[in-house]
């Protein structure tokens, strides 16, 4: 289910389960997927988005009414890839609970905030960061202008998404997004990016429970 680099494959533990037909082995991430747990680890790109979206859709087909848990430890990445994950989270019928562990920066913070209301969590030593999208432009002046306009449109769209999920005003979001804004979990809760800071997991957090 997961496509890791060769060096990373050696570091992914295998889980052996006994069945009526003998032993069956899973990599740890595929085993956790059976419990409706998905991991977003590392940068957000098209390959990662394809994996996350396909798992969300698969779990919806398995049970459209049972929650899905998305654990996030990401520095962010490509806006288009992040929005593909975001749209899929909103599109499917199960509610998606989000949990930040380590960091949720840039698009990672947007996906953290996009979890189901009341089901957005952070571990106590995580860091959360929001900022405006960036991009490089090259080519003719007219091409640079077109790319700059597209970045401005993306910034406006991202601001609207943060407004929707945090409850902050557009002016507040625009001001906070102007530069990198790092937050502790407590600050992220006050800002509306998450609902709770958790040290121990209650049964309803991160186990795919409805």
Swiss-Prot record:
Swiss-Prot/TrEMBL keywords: Cytoplasm, Hydrolase, Protease, Serine protease
EC numbers for this chain: 3.4.21.92
Gene Ontology cellular component list: cytoplasm; endopeptidase Clp complex
Keyword Translocase part of the UniProt annotation: no
SUPFAM superfamilies xrefs: ClpP/crotonase (SSF52096)
Main location: cytoplasm
Cysteines engaged in disulfide bonds, as pairs: none
Subcellular location: Cytoplasm
Record carries keyword DNA damage: no
GO annotation, biological process: protein quality control for misfolded or incompletely synthesized proteins
Origin: domain of life: Bacteria
Catalytic activity entry: Hydrolysis of proteins to small peptides in the presence of ATP and magnesium. alpha-casein is the usual test substrate. In the absence of ATP, only oligopeptides shorter than five residues are hydrolyzed (such as succinyl-Leu-Tyr-|-NHMec, and Leu-Tyr-Leu-|-Tyr-Trp, in which cleavage of the -Tyr-|-Leu- and -Tyr-|-Trp bonds also occurs)
InterPro entries noted in UniProt: ClpP, ClpP/crotonase-like_dom_sf, ClpP/TepA, ClpP_His_AS, ClpP_Ser_AS
Active-site residues from the entry: 106 (nucleophile), 131
Example of a GO MF term: serine-type endopeptidase activity
A Pfam family per the record: CLP_protease
Family membership noted in the UniProt record: Belongs to the peptidase S14 family.
Subunit and interaction comment: Fourteen ClpP subunits assemble into 2 heptameric rings which stack back to back to give a disk-like structure with a central cavity, resembling the structure of eukaryotic proteasomes.
Described purpose of this protein according to its UniProt entry: Cleaves peptides in various proteins in a process that requires ATP hydrolysis. Has a chymotrypsin-like activity. Plays a major role in the degradation of misfolded proteins.
NCBIfam families per the UniProt record, alphabetical: clpP, PRK00277.1, PRK12553.1
Protein name in UniProt: ATP-dependent Clp protease proteolytic subunit
Gene of this entry: clpP
């Amino acid at each position: 289910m997961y496509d890791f680099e060769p060096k990373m494959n050696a570091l992914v533990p295998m889980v052996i389960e006994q069945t009526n037909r003998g032993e069956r082995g899973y990599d740890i991430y595929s085993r956790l997927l059976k419990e409706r747990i998905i991991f977003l680890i590392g940068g957000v790109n098209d390959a990662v988005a394809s994996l996350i979206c396909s798992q969300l859709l698969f779990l919806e087909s398995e049970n459209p009414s049972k929650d899905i848990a998305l654990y996030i430890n990401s520095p962010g990445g490509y806006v288009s890839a992040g929005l593909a994950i975001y749209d899929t989270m909103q599109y499917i019928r199960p509610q998606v609970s989000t949990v930040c562990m380590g960091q949720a920066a840039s698009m990672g913070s947007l996906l953290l905030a996009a979890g189901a209301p009341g089901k957005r969590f952070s571990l106590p030593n995580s860091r959360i960061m929001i900022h405006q999208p960036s991009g490089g432009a090259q080519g003719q002046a007219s091409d640079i202008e077109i790319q700059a306009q597209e970045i401005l449109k993306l910034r406006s769209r991202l601001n609207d998404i943060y407004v929707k999920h945090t409850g902050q005003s557009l002016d507040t979001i625009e001001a906070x997004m102007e530069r990198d804004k790092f937050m502790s979990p407590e600050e992220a809760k006050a800002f509306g990016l998450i609902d709770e800071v958790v040290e121990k997991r209650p049964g309803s957090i991160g186990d795919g429970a409805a």
